[in-house]
């Protein structure tokens, strides 16, 4: 079975469910982690869960396919959408579906959606302009869903890290810009307890792509996890590790659905393009 096919994605989810993992959205995680009573703490320690996070960087129609697989298995996930103008293939999906139609379809399947923000990059590092841009597009996505979580888009070729928006401050109030003032309850890179939650991402079209990732990595923890042997390259290796009980109890898995396809031509194209991107990112990381 080909890696990064929809078939092996289903097999990955089946392996997790067979081992007793609960598959949850990022909002589910945040809401549970906010509860601090003793019963909740004990349950959280014992419960096995995987946060399913999808970054919709391109080909949003692919995200609808993974969302349908998850729905058929009775699970929920979170889909973070970039604004349509910068999403490759963002204006049209399968059977001519428009970008808004794809978003609505994923919401209808019971999944969470959020804003995959890159406002610092799009606004050339102008913090004040980026804050206004962020608020505008947050409201855009709230047309389709009551967005409560957001996630930074890495934009590896940009010199600006969009998480730096939260280091900027409002000249009128003298306070830092704060997404929580807008009803946002969580951002995966900023509001996840990575001392408790192990992070896996398919960045680079593999599961150890953090080595060439510019921003989709967890500094301070990545090296520690690697020393513990929590390092797998292919989805086949990851599934084997799950079956052997080697995966930690609490995990966040991030995928980029444009990489997952059963279409042979699209599969090979993605493989070649991603290999080229990895070379470029490797040069950027140094």
Stretches with model-predicted labels:
Residues 1-53, 57-97, 104, 108-109, ...:
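Terminal accessory/targeting
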